[in-house]
């Protein structure tokens, strides 16, 4: 039984970044292809890669669930589900953070602070395990996520 469920997608800022990156790639490919038509197939690799990455971001979503077994975090199509058993949770608390400064960006990140799963925003729940691992879960409903984890742990202990 799930006591918390949240789905998040990347915001408009991702699309702006992808457009900023893709326009020069496409323009460069067209410019080079105009000078050497035989190289067209090789040159199209750049725009195709950009299109595939854009498509992945379009369908990718961060899904967070809390149930009687634990916390489950997944980036559909981009990363396998991360399962954190309730018995491994030492502490979970809602907090503000900077995805770029604290974890080096958005998506699935590993930094000296631990793992992060986020699509944007500056709020999340930091889950600290009994083994010392730290997992930041970005959430637009951080207080609800924190409460759901606490409730699931309490229900398991009862």
Question: Which residues does each PLM region occupy?
Answer:
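A residue-level signal for beta-strand positions that form part of recognition/binding surfaces
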Residues: 1, 63, 124
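N-terminal membrane-targeting/pre-transmembrane regions
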Residues: 1-37, 116-117, 131-134, 140-147, ...
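Hydrophobic alpha-helical transmembrane segments of multipass integral membrane proteins
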Residues: 19-26, 46-54
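Hydrophobic alpha-helical transmembrane segments
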Residues: 36-48
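Generic signal for short, ordered secondary-structure residues
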Residues: 46, 50, 68-69, 106, ...
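Conserved beta-hairpin
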Residues: 49-91
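Non-transmembrane, membrane-adjacent beta-strand/coil modules in membrane-associated proteins
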Residues: 74-140
């Amino acid at each position: 039984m799930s006591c918390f469920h949240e789905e998040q997608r990347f915001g408009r800022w991702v699309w702006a970044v992808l457009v900023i990156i893709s326009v020069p790639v496409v323009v460069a490919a067209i410019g080079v292809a105009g000078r050497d038509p035989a190289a067209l197939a090789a040159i199209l690799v750049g725009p195709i890669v950009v299109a595939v990455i854009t498509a992945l971001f379009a369908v990718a979503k961060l899904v967070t669930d809390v149930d009687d077994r634990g916390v489950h975090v997944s980036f559909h199509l981009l990363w396998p589900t991360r399962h954190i058993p309730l018995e491994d949770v030492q502490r979970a608390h809602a907090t503000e953070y900077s995805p770029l400064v604290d974890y080096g960006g958005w998506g699935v990140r590993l930094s000296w602070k631990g793992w992060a799963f986020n699509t944007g925003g500056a709020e999340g729940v930091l889950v600290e395990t009994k083994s010392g691992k730290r997992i930041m879960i970005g959430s637009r409903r951080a207080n609800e996520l924190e409460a759901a984890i606490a409730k699931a742990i309490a229900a398991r202990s009862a």
